């Protein structure tokens, strides 16, 4: 038995360009000699906000990790802005695609040191830390500037996730891959992060994201299309 992709798509908004920012073509993933999904094809257009839904075990996280270049696939290809992803193109691709998960991994030090540290990575060395942008984001989150001086070791789970979001969004990715990023957070913090992502997309409306969540109310608020992973005979 194979898990195949069933796609429920609404008509994409008229203002969106005709060219997809990301194309998934006949993608397949095998785990323990079993196809988790196969013949998986869909497109992501600039400005889209897409929910990835499906039962537990349908491979939602595996899909996002594969799209981020973190996990292998056994069939098909991923095309970003017309360029097929391969080992040569991967560093450039990873500078444009950022994966956020439920439990972030942070470096030791203060919040601001975490935000600055990412610019030392090879794929982001061409960028410059923008403190004003971070302060604008903190204002949206109802956080004061002294939050930047907090030691990471003293942060709550919700505050750590805020740092992870800030660290990702400041890099101005073309696509965000959000894997249950607010699942363990209280409603207020979750909705603040939703607003932060909305502000990030408003800055450049061609940005797009894929978001997984077990909360249908959240997905109704933050997405305009669904991709559904279902098991098929």
Model-predicted segments: where are they?
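Conserved structural motif at the start of ABC-family nucleotide-binding domains
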Residues: 22, 36-39
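Conserved ABC ATPase "signature" region
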Residues: 129-147
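Catalytic Walker B motif of ABC-type/P-loop ATPase nucleotide-binding domains
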Residues: 176-180
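Helix-to-loop junction immediately C-terminal to a conserved catalytic motif
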Residues: 68
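Conserved ABC transporter NBD signature motif
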Residues: 76-84, 93
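Conserved ABC ATPase signature
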Residues: 151-155, 159
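Q-loop/switch helix immediately C-terminal to the Walker
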Residues: 103, 109-126, 133
